[in-house]
């Protein structure tokens, strides 16, 4: 496999082509952003940690029957992945009220929900990734109802698998967001699963072990990511 030119650079990753048109190299950066890019910073070795965490969690999910774009971890910052067309939606899964949902609905952070909540947002930086519903997504040509049904099914399987896994590591999976990619073989879980994309709280202390520490200037951000890596790697 030969790495070629950069195809795309996002907030947290760079995507490079390879000599195989069906694969890409994903490079994990140390850049940190919050509030749709309004807050910017750097977390030392974040890319290294998130690459490792994502690689291990994607391998776990593959074993549990969730198809992903992940092929292999190449080095400490890069992984080889299947090339996909990203559906321009984020699927957000919430087990406990926190973040924007708690604020939007006037709920206390940490409130248990009577059922898991599934939301979608339109991936559009200019619009600040607005929350939309299924009908919006289909009406403006982003997806189909059939595809959405499959996306929610993937999200539910990811949630069930990771909730159980993290619980065994003494971590509460509060909420997370995923991205889905279209490939010739159907839909694949893409992007990453890490403290950048999940809210993860220590089961005993309630300590936040995710990007909220950066968002809210709580300090010890690197240490929190390292703690998640340590527990995932048990």
From Swiss-Prot:
Ligase as UniProt keyword: yes
Molecular functions (GO terms): ATP binding; phosphoribosylaminoimidazolesuccinocarboxamide synthase activity
Coiled-coil positions: none
Family that this chain belongs to: Belongs to the SAICAR synthetase family.
UniProtKB keywords: ATP-binding, Ligase, Nucleotide-binding, Purine biosynthesis
UniProt cross-references to SUPFAM superfamilies, sorted A to Z: SAICAR synthase-like
Signal peptide residues on this chain, from the entry's feature table: none
Alphabetical GO biological process terms: 'de novo' IMP biosynthetic process; cobalamin biosynthetic process
NCBIfam families according to UniProt: purC
Family annotation (CDD domains): SAICAR_synt_PurC
Protein name as it appears in the record: Phosphoribosylaminoimidazole-succinocarboxamide synthase
One Pfam family of this chain: SAICAR_synt
Pathway entry: Purine metabolism; IMP biosynthesis via de novo pathway; 5-amino-1-(5-phospho-D-ribosyl)imidazole-4-carboxamide from 5-amino-1-(5-phospho-D-ribosyl)imidazole-4-carboxylate: step 1/2
Reactions catalysed, as given in the entry: 5-amino-1-(5-phospho-D-ribosyl)imidazole-4-carboxylate + L-aspartate + ATP = (2S)-2-[5-amino-1-(5-phospho-beta-D-ribosyl)imidazole-4-carboxamido]succinate + ADP + phosphate + 2 H(+)
Record has Ligase as a keyword: yes
EC number(s) recorded for this UniProt protein: 6.3.2.6
InterPro entries (alphabetical): SAICAR_synt/ADE2_N, SAICAR_synt_PurC, SAICAR_synth, SAICAR_synthetase, SAICAR_synthetase_CS
